[in-house]
Amino acid sequence: EGERLKITPRKRKYLIVYPFIKKVDWYLLSKERRQKMMTEHIGTGHKYPSVSINTSYSFGLDDQEQMVSFETDYPEDFLDLVEEMRSQQARAYTEKDTPIITCIYKDFKDIKILFK
């Protein structure tokens, strides 16, 4: 078996997660064309170092194809990042990217007492 990337939370105050589904037309594009659009997205993400981004495939686990998560201490930076990404070419190939779930980081030991 191949090695899988392990995503380790950075313990920033806010975690924003949402599923997304790409349109069929996305998969009909050449790999090179898709990569060019994703490179634009990635470049935009690098402009916001206060926001960590992780994308994971989830096809077959639920209705969505992928999940994306953002960790930040500055929700205003997340909003600026998403606003900029929504005007890029890859956005035209997104069929659905809701619901958006926003969480505040809590250590597990602090929340497990709620379930006793």
Residue map of PLM features:
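Short S/T/G/P-rich N-terminal loop/turn motif that feeds into the first structured element of a domain
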Residues: 1-47, 59, 109-116
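Short, well-ordered beta-strand segments in beta-rich or mixed alpha/beta enzyme
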Residues: 15-21, 60-85
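Generic "edge-of-domain/loop-turn" microfeature
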Residues: 25, 75-77, 107
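An amphipathic, aromatic/His-enriched active-site/gating alpha helix that lines ligand/cofactor pockets
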Residues: 47-50, 73-102
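A short linear hydrophobic-aromatic micro-motif
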Residues: 51-57
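A general secondary-structure junction signal
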Residues: 57-59, 104
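Short terminal or interdomain "cap/linker" segment that borders an active site or interface and mediates
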Residues: 71, 104-113
